[in-house]
């Protein structure tokens, strides 16, 4: 195959957003919500093309009359029919590229069940007829995009958070930690604490409004207890937000109480350790000789690491846990919302990567299990 002249397509399937584009670009051409919406009462949508499903932004704009579903939960695909719709939309509507003409690089969550990546492989070759494909682990791509091959990635998106120690380009599976606490949980928690203020948000459409409030107004306190005290004494941290109907609501200490759950999951009724402790535990599971390299290269990735104040707070909390002489460095690249995609763009453009693709011939010969031999 003359793969040199054909650009690969890179698709990062997140629980919240799909990031898609062409290898070699420095940013995804298309970012849209991983949503499939179906009419609440079929037959109601007069004068609109009778579609049984809407994907992405179109589902978002018509959300009032649709039931919205996310086919990826906690980083793992739970509804393959909807997932196929999302991929179809990605290739044909967003990228306007025929998948049978391009190698496709997909991403997956660390510790993804084996059956999941086999199913991805099968759909790509059998439904979309791709000439070649590859499945890469999201956190490893984020590290590549930061220009490193060794470090620990704290990747937190909409559906799941992971800490993934990587040494010389290889993830260390025994030390990967997974935390089922990410952006979607924080949005739900913000809905809950806004309820206590008397603002009732409940439908799937209203949840999207709360997500927007979270992204625009929330931040992480360096010291939570002190911030709470300050917020009780003054109204400086109060901000107003205009709802789509023109009403204005006021958001106060919810601004930092919401993302505090990343450090204190007990706020959500979860027994898990916070992201600082999880990162520390992940490093402790690694060989003592490489820990220094990991402590000095803690790389943030994913939309849920975009809160103001997260780098300072993590540095402080991990310094408290780590050996006292250890130098702690948290790296927060400005483009970290898309660093998984950027890493995929870099990887699939490398000349050395071209022999890594799983080709159609190999798939026909070995079946879906080929993915475990070629993608690691």
Curated annotation (Swiss-Prot):
Monomer (G-actin). Oligomer (F-actin). Polymerization of globular actin (G-actin) leads to a structural filament (F-actin) in the form of a two-stranded helix. Unlike for mammalian monomeric actin, parasite monomeric actin is able to induce oligomerization in the presence of ATP or ADP. Mg(2+), which is used to coordinate ATP, is required for polymerization. Interacts with MyoA. Interacts with DNase I with low affinity. ATP binds at residues 15-17, 19, 158-160, 214-215, 303. Changing residue 74 to Q: No formation of long filaments. Reduces inorganic phosphate (Pi) release. No effect of Mg(2+) or K(+) on Pi release. Filament elongation rate appears normal. One of its GO terms (cellular component) is cytoplasm. It comes from the Eukaryota. Actin is a highly conserved protein that polymerizes to produce filaments that form cross-linked networks in the cytoplasm. Polymerizes into shorter and less stable actin filaments compared to ACT2/actin-2; this is thought to facilitate gliding motility and host cell invasion. Has ATPase activity. ATP hydrolysis leads to the formation of a stable intermediate ADP-inorganic phosphate (Pi) actin, which is followed by the release of Pi. ATP hydrolysis affects filament stability; ADP-bound actin depolymerizes much faster than ATP- or ADP-Pi-bound actin. The gene is ACT1. Gene3D superfamilies: 3.30.420.40, Actin, Chain A, domain 4 (3.90.640.10). Changing residue 272 to C: 5-fold increase in inorganic phosphate (Pi) release in presence of Mg(2+). SMART domains: ACTIN. Keywords: ATP-binding, Cytoplasm, Cytoskeleton, Hydrolase, Nucleotide-binding, Nucleus. One of its GO terms (molecular function) is structural constituent of cytoskeleton. InterPro entries: Actin, Actin/actin-like_CS, Actin_CS, ATPase_NBD. The keyword Nucleotide-binding applies. This is Actin-1. Residues 40-61 are annotated as: DNAseI-binding D loop. Changing residue 115 to A: Failure to form long filaments. Inorganic phosphate (Pi) release is slightly better in presence of Ca(2+) than Mg(2+). Slight decrease in inorganic phosphate (Pi) release rates in presence of Mg(2+) or Mg(2+) and K(+).
